[in-house]
A protein has these predicted regions:
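N-terminal metal-binding scaffold of metallo-dependent hydrolase/deaminase domains
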Residues: 1-48, 53-59
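Divalent metal-coordination and catalytic microenvironments
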Residues: 14, 30, 35, 56, ...
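Hydrophobic faces of well-ordered beta-strands that scaffold small-molecule active sites
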Residues: 62-66, 123-125, 148-153, 186-190, ...
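Short, acidic/polar
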Residues: 104-112, 167-180
């Protein structure tokens, strides 16, 4: 690299992959001016530019983790629950980096460095309670290198459920829009709709058409209503769904039926004001995002006949354009599982007996945290892997 001005840079001779510009492994140069990629540099700028020779290497946009848990109260509950986790991985302070610790739940500095080392530049916190938004933003701001955002949980919000029960989509949309603007959220998250509200009374819902206790609104109505709100507001991302019955044998059918709920909606993402010019359209075709699909891909009717339902769910997903997913794959070894689905975590606690934490956010949502070890010797874990 030339020891010269940092205002301009050229990354040369790399194999470039850029789906939005229909570039698939071509050898191209990347020109950067003041931190932004540009189409070209002037002769004077190119002469003074720092040069990185990426010959034989892959060059691609920074990775985007669309679903993670990296900031907020449940993450800190995990850090407090797992002092042993911090001994497993310790990063010493250097001249340009902070110290940090933590393996499955790293400190904010360390998680920023770890993500960057893997090539990620953007990470989203997938469950931000409105009452805990300020602290979530504090931690995201303290995380180095990464661009970050958060999804706000609405699937068990009292006001949302009341408006949907009344059939007033416009009022629900106005409420969601105000909440997102006030709390600086990026998207709408829906976690075990109707079930988390029931968990405040030690109950859950078992199906999409079972009404919850006090609002008498079903999971199906909440998913459909929030998806309609999402498109009415023209958000850049789809409704982010954590399906009902997560982690239970046979739940792939619940996941499939949940995805079918939004299939008749027309996607409406308003990206004109914020999207850079690209060769491929930035308009999304999807109306629902299924989070950590692996945990919603179980077959069988009990743990005795548990099997993978992934082929069946994948077959449906591949036949439709309204769905986008992340796999939610798990590696073997220690984990600190955390979710806005309190009853699912309690079920896991009853199976494993590991350290468990539960929290209820009044009128809004809940969460659960559990330490876990994924084992090669476990038939269930091996099937999940």
């Amino acid at each position: 690299m030339a020891a010269n001005s940092t205002k301009t840079m050229i990354i040369k001779n790399g194999y470039l992959f850029d789906p939005l510009n229909a570039i698939d492994g071509e050898v191209k140069d990347i020109f950067i001016r003041e931190g932004k990629v540009v189409s070209s540099l002037s002769g004077h700028e190119a002469k003074d530019a720092a040069v990185i020779d990426a010959r034989g290497k892959t060059v691609m946009p920074g990775g985007v983790d669309a679903h993670s848990h990296v900031a907020g109260t449940k993450v800190n509950a995990g850090r407090l629950m797992r002092p042993e986790d911090h001994y497993k991985s310790v990063r010493k302070k250097t001249d340009i980096t902070h110290s940090g610790s933590g393996y499955t739940v790293p400190s904010v500095y360390k998680q920023g460095y770890d993500y960057a080392a893997m090539g990620y530049t953007t990470v989203f916190e997938a469950a931000m309670p409105p009452l805990e938004a300020r602290h979530t933003h504090e931690e995201m701001r303290a995380t180095p290198i990464l661009d970050m955002g958060a999804y706000m949980v609405f699937g068990n919000n009292w006001f949302v459920m009341r408006y949907l029960k009344e059939g007033d989509i416009e009022k629900a949309a106005a409420y969601v829009a105000w909440m997102m603007r006030t709390h600086k959220a990026y998207g709408i998250k829906c976690v075990n709709p109707a079930g988390v509200e029931n968990w405040g009374w030690a109950k859950n819902v078992k199906g999409l058409d079972e009404p919850n206790i006090h609002f008498e609104v079903t999971s199906r109505e909440i998913i459909r209503g929030l998806a309609e709100v999402n498109e009415l507001l023209g958000l850049p991302m789809s409704l982010h769904l954590h399906a009902n019955n997560l982690g239970h044998p046979g739940n792939w059918e619940t996941a499939r039926d949940s995805l079918m709920i939004t299939s008749s909606l027309e996607p409406n993402s308003k990206t004109e004001l914020e999207w850079a010019q690209t060769r491929e359209s930035a308009k999304r075709k999807q109306t629902v995002y299924l989070a950590h699909a692996q945990f919603s891909s179980y077959g069988g009717s009990s743990w005795r006949d548990f099997c993978s339902g992934a082929p069946d769910l994948a077959k449906y997903i591949n036949q439709t354009e309204n769905v986008v997913i992340d796999s939610g794959s798990v590696p073997f070894g220690p984990a600190t599982t955390m979710t806005g689905d309190g009853p699912a975590q309690h079920d896991l606690y009853m199976l494993t007996g590991q350290k468990w934490s539960n929290c209820d956010i009044e009128m809004e949502c809940g969460s659960g945290v559990l330490s876990l070890m994924y084992l090669k010797s476990s038939p269930v874990h091996a099937t999940m892997w």
